[in-house]
Curated annotation (Swiss-Prot):
One of its GO terms (biological process) is protein transport. Keywords: Cytoplasm, Nucleus, Protein transport, Repressor, Transcription, Transcription regulation, Transport. Residues 74-139 form the NAC-A/B domain. It comes from the Eukaryota. This is Nascent polypeptide-associated complex subunit beta. Residues 177-196 have a biased composition (Acidic residues). The gene is egd1.
Length: 196
């Protein structure tokens, strides 16, 4: 037996099947016949955007925060240790300090570092906290470590320091002279005597 519903569908009760639907109707198996409205139609790009956003979360749930994973330096240290072990580095004992001279005249100073070396591969590893210092800060104890290039830079540094001090002394002398060269604004009158 076929029943025609006013919504434009035919349903066969004996077989329990839907025999015919009209294009303007939408029938879902869980609910009764539902008619679509012209406003419920969405273009493809909007519907895919909405379905993609709903796949990740349900309605009313807060947005999921992305967890930022910070790499620890421990993993890098382990890789470095493994590479150094392959190179067969050996520890060097009784190193009090290590100084690295930069081109700008500054020095990277390591106090009591751990030093490992592999002479065949010309590799040295320093472990410790390095501080960048000026060459003048380390001058008394560093003179025996200076090579010919560093000695030349030390001479230049000393010359520039002396020139700077001469310029400062000359500038102070000029300031004193400038105070004496103040012209009188009114000829013949001295206002300083009135103040005293």
């Amino acid at each position: 037996m076929l029943n025609r519903s006013p919504s434009g569908t035919a349903f066969d009760h004996e077989n329990g099947k839907l025999t015919h639907t009209y294009p303007q109707c939408i029938i879902s198996p869980s609910s009764s016949h539902t008619r679509s409205t012209p406003n419920s139609y969405k273009p493809d790009h909007e519907s895919t955007r909405l379905t993609n956003s709903l796949k990740n979360r349900g309605k009313g749930t807060p947005r999921r925060k992305v967890k930022k994973v910070h790499k620890s330096s421990g993993a890098d240290d382990k890789k470095l240790q493994a590479t150094l072990k392959k190179m067969n580095v050996q520890p060097i004992q009784a190193i009090e300090e290590v100084n690295m001279f930069k081109e700008d005249g500054n020095v990277i100073h390591f106090g009591a570092p751990k030093v490992h070396a592999s002479v065949p591969s010309n590799t040295f590893a320093l472990y410790g906290n390095g501080e960048e210092k000026e060459l003048t800060e380390l001058v008394p104890g560093i003179l025996n470590q200076l090579g010919p290039d560093s000695l030349a830079s030390l001479r230049k540094l000393a010359e520039s320091y002396q020139n700077m001090q001469k310029n400062q002394a000359g500038a102070e002398g000029k300031k004193d002279d400038d105070e004496d060269d103040i012209p009188d604004l009114v000829e013949g009158e001295n206002f300083e005597s009135n103040v005293e």
